[in-house]
Amino acid sequence: MLSNPKRTRFRKQHRGRMKGKSFRGNRICFGRYALQALEPAWITARQIEAGRRAITRYARRGGKIWVRIFPDKPVTLRPTETRMGSGKGSPEYWVAVVKPGRILYEMGGVSETVARAAISIAASKMPIRSQFIRLEI
């Protein structure tokens, strides 16, 4: 799984703020079941990968998983015990900015009980409250 963009226009970004709710990526598009965020947060590439692995491991064979978020924001950190000044720190890891309503993972090709269990395991690895939703036909 990709954990960061191949290339970006700029190495460092402002932190920004997470106002409002997500209007993009808030509907199920690919699978039948999904994990939806209920709180705003930065989700790191490692957390995304841990959730993906948990779902894959639980679902075993059968079923398909779609990861609907991508870590495209670099987070900079200063070295420890460094004095203030002398510019911004270097990029250390990547995060996905997630607002309430955003779909994190989607799943299809499995029964609802399997999907619910797999997604609940992935939800426990996320730093935010989230809910299981299913496609209403």
UniProtKB/Swiss-Prot annotation:
- What name appears for this protein in its UniProt entry? Large ribosomal subunit protein uL16c
GO CC terms:
chloroplast; mitochondrial large ribosomal subunit
* Keyword Ribosomal protein among record annotations: yes
Query: Which InterPro entries does the UniProt record give?
Result: Ribosomal_uL16, Ribosomal_uL16_bact-type, Ribosomal_uL16_CS, Ribosomal_uL16_dom, Ribosomal_uL16_sf
Query: Keywords, A to Z?
Result: Chloroplast, Plastid, Ribonucleoprotein, Ribosomal protein
Family annotation (SUPFAM superfamilies): Ribosomal protein L16p/L10e
Complex and partners: Part of the 50S ribosomal subunit.
Q: Which GO terms describe its biological process?
A: mitochondrial translation
Q: Can you tell which superkingdom this protein's organism belongs to?
A: Eukaryota
Alphabetized Gene3D superfamilies for the sequence? Ribosomal protein L10e/L16
Family assignment from sequence similarity: Belongs to the universal ribosomal protein uL16 family.
The record's annotation in HAMAP family points to: Ribosomal_uL16
Please tell me where this protein is predominantly located. plastid
Species name:
Hordeum vulgare (Barley)
Q: Which Pfam family, just one, is annotated for this protein? A: Ribosomal_L16
Q: Which PANTHER family did the record assign? A: 50S/60S RIBOSOMAL PROTEIN L16 (PTHR12220), LARGE RIBOSOMAL SUBUNIT PROTEIN UL16M (PTHR12220:SF13)
Q: Which NCBIfam families match?
A: rplP_bact (TIGR01164)
